[in-house]
C-alpha cells in the first residue's frame, strides 16, 4: 500500500501535541517530491516564502511556537530534513551539498525562485550550504547555534565540563554503528540527556521532549537517520573549505542563546560573509524557538523586513 499523499498521524500536524491555538487552521502537512527523495513539510501563511530548517534531534515541530506569528507576513515552510520525521530516509546523501539541493528542489516544487532561510543547529550547516551553493535563490539567511565543520576553529581536546555536556554528542554521532547499538532501546536516556544539557536553566517542556524522543524511537530507520548528517561531516567539511572561497552576498543574522554558544555563530559567520548581524538572546540555552519564541520572532521580523518589503508576493497578500 502506498503512503497517503497528505500526511496524517504521528509526525504530521494532525498527530502533533500542544500546538498553538488555531495552528491547524493555517498549517497543513504535505509530502513534496524533491528529486530522488520525498520530503515532509508543514506549510502555511501568505507572503514571500520563509524556509525553516530544524536541528538535531528535532523536526519541523521545533518551530511550532514561532510559525503562527511568522505566517502573518510569510508563507512558512517548516521541513523535515532527509532522514528525519516523515521524510524519506535513504542510506546516502547526508552531506550538506546534497541536503541543500533537496531543499532547492523542495522550493522549486512550491514555485519559489527566491526565499529567505532560517536554520539552527544542524539546520545552520544546511542553511549555510544553501546560501553558499545557491546565492541567487536565498535573499536573507538567519543561522545559529552550531559550529560549521571546516570553518569554525576546532575546540581543544580537553574541554570544560559544561562544554563536554553540550558537545560530546558530535563525535559520538559520527560513529558508524556503535552509537545506534548503544542508543537503541535507550532513546529516552540518550536524547533526554541531550535536551536537558543543551537547554541551560530553562528546560524544555516534558511533552515536547517526549514527542521528539518517541519519533526517534519509532523505528530503526528513524534512529539511523538521526545520525547520518553527522557521519557525513568529513564530506561537509571539505565542501565548506571550498565554499569559503566565496563570500556570502546576502545579509546574515547570526543567532545564539546566552546560556549556549552566545556569539560563536556570529564569529563563525563573519568568516564567510561581510554583512553579519549578531543576536544573542539572554537567559536562553540552545533551543531558541522553544525557549524564547517571542524574542526570536521579533528579531526575525526586523531582520526580514527588507525582504518582505521588496517582495511582489507581499504586495499581493496585503492587497487581498
Per-segment meaning from a language model:
Residues 315-320:
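A short, charged, Gly/Pro-tolerant segment at domain boundaries
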Residues 2-30, 36-39, 49, 77, ...:
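Flexible "cap/lid" subdomain of the alpha/beta-hydrolase fold that forms the substrate-access gate
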Residues 59-60, 125, 285:
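A short, glycine- and basic residue-enriched loop/turn
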Residues 284-297:
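Catalytic histidine-centered segment of alpha/beta-hydrolase-like enzymes
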Amino acid at each position: 500500500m502506498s503512503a497517503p499523499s497528505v500526511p496524517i498521524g504521528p509526525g504530521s500536524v494532525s498527530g502533533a501535541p500542544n500546538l498553538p491555538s488555531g495552528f491547524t487552521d493555517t498549517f497543513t502537512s504535505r509530502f513534496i517530491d524533491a528529486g530522488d527523495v520525498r520530503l515532509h513539510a508543514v506549510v502555511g501563511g501568505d507572503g514571500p516564502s520563509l524556509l525553516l530548517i530544524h536541528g538535531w534531534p528535532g523536526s519541523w515541530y521545533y518551530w511550532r511556537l514561532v510559525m503562527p506569528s511568522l505566517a502573518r507576513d510569510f508563507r512558512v515552510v517548516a521541513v523535515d530534513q532527509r532522514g528525519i520525521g516523515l521524510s524519506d530516509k535513504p542510506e546516502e546523501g547526508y552531506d550538506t551539498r546534497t541536503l541543500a539541493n533537496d531543499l532547492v528542489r523542495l522550493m522549486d516544487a512550491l514555485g519559489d525562485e527566491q526565499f529567505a532561510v532560517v536554520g539552527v543547529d544542524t539546520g545552520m550547516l544546511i542553511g549555510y550550504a544553501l546560501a553558499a551553493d545557491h546565492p541567487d535563490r536565498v535573499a536573507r539567511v538567519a543561522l545559529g547555534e552550531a559550529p560549521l565543520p571546516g570553518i569554525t576553529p576546532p575546540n581543544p581536546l580537553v574541554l570544560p565540563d559544561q562544554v563536554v555536556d553540550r558537545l560530546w554528542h558530535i563525535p559520538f554521532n559520527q560513529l558508524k554503528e556503535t552509537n545506534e547499538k548503544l542508543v537503541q532501546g535507550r532513546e529516552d536516556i540518550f536524547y533526554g540527556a541531550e535536551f536537558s544539557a543543551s537547554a541551560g536553566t530553562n528546560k524544555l517542556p516534558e511533552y515536547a521532549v517526549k514527542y521528539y524522543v518517541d519519533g526517534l524511537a519509532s523505528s530503526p530507520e528513524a534512529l539511523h537517520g538521526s545520525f547520518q548528517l553527522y557521519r557525513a561531516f568529513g564530506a561537509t567539511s571539505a565542501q565548506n573549505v571550498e565554499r569559503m572561497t566565496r563570500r556570502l552576498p546576502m545579509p546574515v543574522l547570526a543567532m545564539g542563546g546566552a546560556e549556549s554558544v552566545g556569539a560563536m555563530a556570529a564569529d563563525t559567520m563573519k568568516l564567510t560573509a561581510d554583512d553579519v548581524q549578531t543576536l544573542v538572546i539572554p537567559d536562553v540555552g540552545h533551543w531558541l524557538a522553544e525557549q524564547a519564541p517571542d524574542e526570536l520572532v521579533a528579531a526575525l521580523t526586523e531582520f526580514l523586513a527588507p525582504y518582505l518589503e521588496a517582495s511582489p508576493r507581499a504586495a499581493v497578500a496585503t492587497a487581498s
